[in-house]
Amino acid sequence: RWFGVQLDPTCEIQPLIGSKEGILHTTLAFVDHGDQVLVPDPGYPTYTSLSRLLGAQPVPYNLRPERGWQPDFDELEAMDTSRVRLLWCNYPHMPTGARACRETYERLVDFAQRRNLVVVNDNPYSFILNEGEHLSILAIDGAKECCIELNSMSKSHNMPGWRVGMLAANAEFV
């Protein structure tokens, strides 16, 4: 409701022991040995290390300050994504604190649909660093068919150590 996204709590939300559990389970569910995973650079190291642990190849995509830490879509479009299964994004972004704009989410959804891959937005800082409108990638038209969003109450509700999170996606992904 905070993000204006309609989800069926019986089949489109998965409670988690923190969002890191969601990172693990999502990667295990979608990535096989030899696949590729697009990871933001800079970005959360777990996306890369977990991909390597599973025998997948992490492929960095650049986030630069001159672009407001948003993906360079020309660079993404030029990539061979035939072996890519997941694209990780993390907005509000850590370590920079940058927020995604609606256009970034729209372009990520379009990219995922055309390339037949899944975008995972790791969104645990949404209520800490998101001044103004709270954005969810799942609020974008068509996103529920190709996107997953993780969130964590531990950070947003000042509950460190409680490990309370959730995964939101279409019922098939959940």
Question: Whereabouts are the PLM-identified features?
Answer:
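Phosphate-binding glycine-rich loop
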Residues: 1-36
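Short, intrinsically disordered, charge-balanced linker/junction segments flanking boundaries
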Residues: 1-6, 79, 106, 168-174
